[in-house]
């Protein structure tokens, strides 16, 4: 029987309007101090793990009570996740740390259907959440009372400099006709959902960034893990699961010449990735984080539409902000370019500061615009990059089975999520009696759709894809039995 353990902490809010405070994220002018109250559900007599699979916090924002539901991001690390640094004599030192009991969560705000959250619970709560259309940041306060946290909007953080920060990508597709055609296709809401894709990510940290954080590997690791957790959350609406495969820190020297010209650095990094990094471990996309100030106020650069290419599936990003969230947005932006997304056209896209905006904004969004979604859908249709089709093997994702993490793990028949799921039993992650399926383009009300039912409309020369009548999956290229 599940009992609710209530950790009672005095719930208080002290808005310091007009005051200024220096946080890890920078100098903040307008913020609230909150004392979250934690509610967690554990089986009677169970030993509480350091980081629970699911947690709930209650606090107030602008005088209104909010309930933050969090679930551990179980798919964040591959089973063979590795970390590499280098000794003074140049030896490569690679370790395979245990990351099963990590502290990175995603979630939502209760009774806010449009809400999202990406939170690190390593030392208090740090990250962001979206509430009633606004993005808020939360982080612990360094006070004698360790439970105190600051909640604030990103635009209330003082700018670190006045120069506009922008992506250096200027190339465009030769024509946008395919984009227009893709957006005009008639698809049912179910068919419009993006197919599940999986990206195994490699992060490389250059020597300049390593020394920027006092040559402290633990600080680098924590910062990168928070970034990847944020990227994972931002990619979820596109049905993309991000898994961190490796972290390579150039602790003694750079292995390429990191230059002020971002495209040149990306080219050199792509060469090194093809020659060296891919031979260490298989992955789909790599990004170089650097402390270098790129020319022309550029903070990132990536090749357009080159996902899965051994040389060109790369991006370079300046560690341009003390705020993890902002650097993570830039990393997601460059990943978006690799997935075929161009910059948002301010006259055509109904999003002032979405992820693919060419210039970073004071009111930066964590969302992809409709334009970006159209570009991505067209890229999948026209290019169908093969490396991101494969789900991690059930033994490749570090986790014990837990519902709602978007990975089908060992022992699971379905990823159940909510206890109200009519097809999947949330307690066992098994299909309910009489159910054939729980999700998929060929699943309808827990049953396989009839044979030959169209599950994906024809694109170009490709025929309609049709259900087999024996699976919830929609096979490619009209292959049905």
From Swiss-Prot:
Propeptide segment residues: 21-190, 393-408
Cofactor(s) needed: Zn(2+)
Binding residues annotated for Zn(2+), in chain numbering: 333, 337, 343
SMART domains: DISIN
SUPFAM superfamilies the UniProt entry points to: Blood coagulation inhibitor (disintegrin), Metalloproteases ('zincins'), catalytic domain
Tissue: Expressed by the venom gland.
Keyword terms, alphabetized: Cell adhesion impairing toxin, Disulfide bond, Hemostasis impairing toxin, Hydrolase, Metal-binding, Metalloprotease, Platelet aggregation inhibiting toxin, Protease, Secreted, Signal, Toxin, Zinc, Zymogen
Residues covered by the Peptidase M12B domain: 197-392
Disulfide topology: 308-387, 349-371, 351-354, 414-429, 416-424, 423-446, 437-443, 442-467, 455-474
Cellular compartment(s): Secreted
Gene Ontology BP terms: proteolysis
Pfam families recorded: Disintegrin (PF00200), Pep_M12B_propep (PF01562), Reprolysin (PF01421)
Cofactor comment: Binds 1 zinc ion per subunit.
GO MF: metal ion binding; metalloendopeptidase activity; toxin activity
Family indicated by similarity: Belongs to the venom metalloproteinase (M12B) family. P-II subfamily. P-IIa sub-subfamily.
Name recorded for this polypeptide: Zinc metalloproteinase/disintegrin
Source species taxonomy: Eukaryota, Metazoa, Chordata, Craniata, Vertebrata
């Amino acid at each position: 029987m599940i009992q609710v353990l209530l950790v009672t902490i005095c719930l208080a809010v002290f808005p310091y309007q007009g005051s200024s405070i220096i946080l890890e994220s920078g100098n903040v002018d307008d913020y609230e101090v909150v004392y979250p109250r934690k509610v967690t559900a554990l089986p009677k007599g169970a030993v509480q793990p350091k980081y629970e699979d699911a947690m709930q916090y209650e606090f107030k924002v602008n005088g209104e009570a909010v309930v933050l539901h969090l679930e551990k991001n179980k798919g964040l690390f591959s089973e063979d996740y590795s970390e590499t640094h280098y000794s003074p004599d140049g030896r490569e030192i690679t370790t395979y740390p245990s990351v099963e009991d990590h502290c990175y969560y995603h979630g939502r705000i209760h009774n806010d259907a449009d809400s999202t959250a990406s939170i690190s619970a390593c030392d208090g709560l740090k990250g962001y959440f979206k509430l009633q259309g606004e993005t808020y940041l939360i982080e612990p306060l360094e006070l004698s009372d360790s439970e105190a946290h600051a909640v604030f909007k990103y635009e209330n953080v003082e700018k670190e400099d006045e120069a506009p920060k922008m992506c250096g990508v200027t190339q465009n597709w030769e024509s946008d006709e395919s984009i227009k055609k893709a957006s005009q296709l008639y698809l049912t809401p179910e068919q419009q959902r993006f197919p599940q894709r999986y990206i195994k990510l490699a992060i490389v940290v250059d020597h300049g960034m390593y020394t920027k954080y006092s040559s402290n590997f633990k600080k680098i690791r924590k910062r990168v893990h928070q970034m990847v957790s944020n990227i994972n959350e931002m990619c979820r609406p596109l049905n993309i699961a991000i898994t961190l495969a490796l972290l390579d820190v150039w602790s003694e020297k750079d292995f390429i010449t990191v230059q002020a010209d971002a495209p040149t650095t990306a080219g050199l990094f792509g060469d090194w990735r093809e020659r060296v990094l891919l031979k260490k471990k298989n992955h789909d996309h790599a990004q170089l984080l650097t402390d270098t100030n790129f020319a022309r106020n550029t903070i990132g650069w990536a090749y357009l539409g080159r996902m899965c290419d051994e040389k060109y599936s790369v991006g370079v990003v300046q560690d341009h902000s003390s705020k993890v969230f902002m650097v993570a947005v830039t990393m997601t932006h460059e990943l978006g370019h690799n997935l075929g997304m161009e910059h948002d056209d301010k006259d055509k896209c109904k999003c002032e500061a979405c992820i693919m905006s060419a210039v970073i904004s004071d009111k930066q969004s964590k969302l992809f615009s409709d334009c970006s979604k159209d570009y991505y859908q067209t890229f999948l249709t026209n290019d169908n990059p093969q490396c991101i089709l494969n789900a991690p093997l059930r033994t490749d994702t570090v986790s014990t089975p837990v519902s709602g993490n978007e990975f089908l793990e060992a022992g699971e028949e379905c990823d159940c999520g909510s206890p109200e799921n009519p097809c999947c039993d949330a307690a066992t992650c098994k299909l309910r009696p009489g159910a054939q399926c729980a999700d998929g383009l060929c699943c309808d009300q827990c049953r396989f759709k009839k044979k030959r039912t169209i599950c994906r409309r024809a694109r170009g020369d490709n025929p309609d894809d049709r259900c087999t009548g024996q699976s919830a999956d929609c096979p490619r290229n009209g292959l049905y039995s």
